[in-house]
Amino acid sequence: MSNIFRGLGVALITPFKSDMSIDFEALERLVNYQLDNGADFLCILATTGETPCLTRSEKDEITRVVKGVVKGRVPLLKYCGGNNTRAVIEEMKSSDWEGIDGILSICPFYNKPSQEGLYQHFKAIAEASPLPLVLYNVPGRTGVNMKAATTCRIAKDFPNIVGIKEASGSLEQVDEIIKNKSEGFEVISGDDALTFPMIASGAVGVISVIGNALPRQFSRMIRLEFEGNYGEARKIHHQFTELYKLLFVDGNPAGVKALLNDMGMIENVLRLPLVPTEVTTKQKMADILKALHVE
């Protein structure tokens, strides 16, 4: 299998109304905004989508709405993961995957498995998966880092595992994976702030948070890198340096929801235990948007 998840992938937020119900009209607007402004693929129901705070029926409806808007124009990556291997497999078996192009699956969290445990977890999932898999390594959330050697071992043994969303924060680890990975397996940045150096090192794209609000600018940076124009790409990267930090000061997706609210696209609502970003943070981000001439 080959990886089709390249370029700018956007980890879609889930917009809510003030009564905490899902704002499906805003979701449709947001998806069209991505498609009109350079997104190469979309990732639904992952961390940025506040998935732990959604019911199964809400997840199904979000999937239906997004598929209905996209209509095959870009690939769709859908999250299905957890820290109970058997439960993840059961969810895979009971879900409708029509119109979905791949599955994003996270390293088990809280349990803190060994490297062998991580291998066996993804072995079981790969053998059960109906679609190509993209692994997700984010030790800041899971409590365990999947080492480069483990990632490369998994990729070698299971050809339906086509990539990894790598968010360890370690460029050394990224380089080690890219250097030793099997053919057809690719690295995707899981960190907006490290996307520029990761693509320069051989990553093929990003699953982005900032892309929700600024897909045109962020996709341009990525395309410039693909073309070898690192000087112009670096200028865009440096424009975002402060914004990268502010987006996560009060937790994700609080920052990007504040940006989208300032742009008039959504209400600034999150479900507990997440809360909106602080007023001072929101104002700083609004000032950056103004300087970038984003309305």
Q: What residue ranges belong to the model's regions?
A:
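Short, amphipathic alpha-helical "lid/cap" segments that border enzyme active or binding sites
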Residues: 24, 28-31, 148, 282-289
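Short secondary-structure transition/capping segments
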Residues: 54-57, 90, 115-118, 146-148, ...
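Glycine-rich phosphate-binding "P-loop"
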Residues: 137-138, 160-161, 271-272
